């Protein structure tokens, strides 16, 4: 099986998480600057097969698009353009940053460590990926780009 990659998009950093090859476990992978993400992914895909991408979709508590939605859409379009054969799924990312912080707190991470935004972004991406894996298993995953749509 191929891996699945998930992204927690931010204008300063993109948190990235990956499944294991059997798609059982979600692991924090890395953080990259948005301008470096395509090069990073091309290198990664040269060494690891990837079945799908998952992008955290920013929503407000009222279930409306957040102020970062336009940036995330631009990121999705960048991925579509550069990796047109890879499907993209969307997952509601509300509360992932606070869940990541709580995870760090429960894990005994020091106060200094909890201030590391790159770590929070990686953990947020992992939470997004775990949510997707649950949705995929119960048939509720939302595909936002199919490779067949590449020519649309």
From Swiss-Prot:
Pfam families attached to this UniProt entry: RuvX (PF03652)
Coiled coil: none
Entry-linked InterPro entries: RNaseH-like_sf, YqgF, YqgF/RNaseH-like_dom, YqgF/RNaseH-like_dom_sf
GO MF annotations in UniProt: nuclease activity
UniProt entry keywords in alphabetical sequence: Cytoplasm, Hydrolase, Nuclease, Ribosome biogenesis
This protein's GO CC annotations: cytosol
Main location as per UniProt: cytoplasm
Protein's cellular compartments: Cytoplasm
Gene3D superfamilies cross-referenced by the UniProt entry: YqgF/RNase H-like domain
GO BP annotation list: rRNA 5'-end processing
EC numbers: 3.1.-.-
Top-rank lineage group of the source organism: Bacteria
Annotated function: Could be a nuclease involved in processing of the 5'-end of pre-16S rRNA.
Family: Belongs to the YqgF nuclease family.
Name this polypeptide is given: Putative pre-16S rRNA nuclease
